[in-house]
Amino acid sequence: MRKSNPNLVTLIDVLLSESAKNEAPVWKEVAERLAKPRRLQAEVNVSKIEKYAKPNEYVVVPGKVLGSGSITKPVKVAALSFSEKAASKIREAGGVCMKIEELLKENPKGSGVRLMV
């Protein structure tokens, strides 16, 4: 891994250790995707979240959430970062924007988490 962002390196290490400790393969997959080059990281629009996520479901995006499209479902979205428009659209729909670390603390087993890339 040749990441220069110390926060990202720490996040990847924490995700891998929590994945092993809690037998949660979703966190290992998220860590592996975050370890890839930035140009290969996920860029997910809110329209894709609207299409595939169920109301009140946890969604994790190992990358950035972008604001193209609309969303009407209240969804809890965890991502590395959000555009301003994406965050406001998710909040207006009754959803929650959070960091991946926050979702990991809230749901260490990774059950009921949908991975979007």
From Swiss-Prot:
Gene3D superfamilies: 3.100.10.10
GO CC entries: cytosolic large ribosomal subunit
GO molecular function, one term: structural constituent of ribosome
GO annotation, biological process: translation
Coiled coil: none
InterPro entries (UniProt xref): Ribosomal_eL18 (IPR000039), Ribosomal_eL18_arc (IPR022947), Ribosomal_uL15/eL18 (IPR021131), Ribosomal_uL15/eL18_sf (IPR036227), Ribosomal_uL15_CS (IPR001196)
Keywords: Ribonucleoprotein, Ribosomal protein
Keyword Ribosomal protein among UniProt keywords: yes
Pfam families: Ribosomal_L18
Family under the similarity heading: Belongs to the eukaryotic ribosomal protein eL18 family.
Protein name: Large ribosomal subunit protein eL18
Source organism (scientific name): Archaeoglobus fulgidus (strain ATCC 49558 / DSM 4304 / JCM 9628 / NBRC 100126 / VC-16)
Taxonomic path: Archaea, Methanobacteriati, Methanobacteriota, Archaeoglobi, Archaeoglobales
Underlying gene: rpl18e
